[in-house]
Amino acid sequence: MMTGELILVGLIVIGLIGRSPIIATAACVLLAVKLLHLSRFLPSIERRGLELGLLFLTLSVLVPFASGKVQMKELIAAFNTWPGWLALIGGAVAAYMNAKGLDLLKLDPQMVVGLVIGSIFGIIFLRGIPVGPLMAAGITAILYKLFKLMSGG
């Protein structure tokens, strides 16, 4: 087995141990692509994977609006209460951090390894729940900027 395949198998095991089915599934799909000699599709997956993932994430978030589960009164309530305003601010901050995470992942794709290992550590030892690499990268980008500011760099 080649190094790439071994790493993918390792990520599958880590994903299973760390209760992160998305990591395990993604590694399984990529391993299947490699083993089925479909590696010619890897550049396309790399180039468009984040966009497709964000599209499906956005679709799932918007389903309550399309299905009518969210009514106009809930939309108005979001602007009339403190929890509603805090939710709006939280959503805006999360979107900003995700954008910074996307920028960081585009600049340094190898950062995913640290994000995956850090996420697994948090899941196992801090009783956290799996989050996407985008949010983890966003937090990393903010921490990186803070570190640079504090170190004078």
UniProtKB/Swiss-Prot annotation:
Keyword flag Transmembrane helix: yes
Compartment(s) where it occurs, according to its Swiss-Prot or TrEMBL record: Cell membrane
Protein's recorded name: UPF0756 membrane protein Pjdr2_2290
Listed GO CC annotations: plasma membrane
UniProt-listed InterPro entries: UPF0756_TM (IPR007382)
HAMAP family: UPF0756
Pfam family name, one: DUF441
Transmembrane intervals: 6-26, 50-70, 75-95, 111-131, 132-152
Family, as annotated: Belongs to the UPF0756 family.
This protein's UniProt keywords: Cell membrane, Membrane, Transmembrane, Transmembrane helix
Predominant location category: membrane
Topology of the protein relative to the lipid bilayer: Multi-pass membrane protein
